[in-house]
Amino acid sequence: MSAKINAKKLEMFDLLKQFIDSKQNLFFLDYRGLNVAQLTELRNKIEGEHGSLKVVKNNIMKMVLKEKNINVVDSCLVGPTVVVTALEEANVIAKIFYDFVKSSTLKVKGGFVLGEFYDEAKVQAYSKLPTKKESISLFASVLKAPVSKLARTLKALADVKN
């Protein structure tokens, strides 16, 4: 029986290792109090933005992180834990689960963004940053404003001369 358990744990270890392989953005959430439907809804929203969500066993996750030389605060791996990974824009994924936090018992424990540990407060601040699309749009409007102002000024001068 012990060999069966160890084989199962080894399989879980390998699956978790593959799950976080080459992912630079990881978030740890406490899903205590969520029902299956809520967890499925959260998973679907996250996967819709190129992220992944996986319920993990804390001890096995600790071993995987240790093997990958990732130091995580112990409080991130206590109690029921889901790990969320982001393939692209991590702050979009963070916005999704923070929107979910407002209407459920979901709690953010912390995470890693580009290899740097973020506590709950930092993850929340990170979730409020503009997305890549929003940043590009803002930058374009900043570039456009002086040109528009110049055009209005030249038009006003032309109107005055006529």
From Swiss-Prot:
Subunit structure: Part of the ribosomal stalk of the 50S ribosomal subunit. The N-terminus interacts with L11 and the large rRNA to form the base of the stalk. The C-terminus forms an elongated spine to which L12 dimers bind in a sequential fashion forming a multimeric L10(L12)X complex.
Gene name linked to the record: rplJ
PANTHER family associated with the record: 39S RIBOSOMAL PROTEIN L10, MITOCHONDRIAL
Keywords of the record: Ribonucleoprotein, Ribosomal protein, RNA-binding, rRNA-binding
Annotated InterPro entries: Ribosomal_uL10, Ribosomal_uL10-like_sf, Ribosomal_uL10_bac, Ribosomal_uL10_bac_type, Ribosomal_uL10_CS_bac
Family under the similarity heading: Belongs to the universal ribosomal protein uL10 family.
Protein name as catalogued: Large ribosomal subunit protein uL10
rRNA-binding recorded as keyword: yes
Cross-referenced NCBIfam families: PRK00099.1-1
GO molecular function list: large ribosomal subunit rRNA binding; structural constituent of ribosome
BP-aspect Gene Ontology terms: translation
HAMAP family, per the entry: Ribosomal_uL10 (MF_00362)
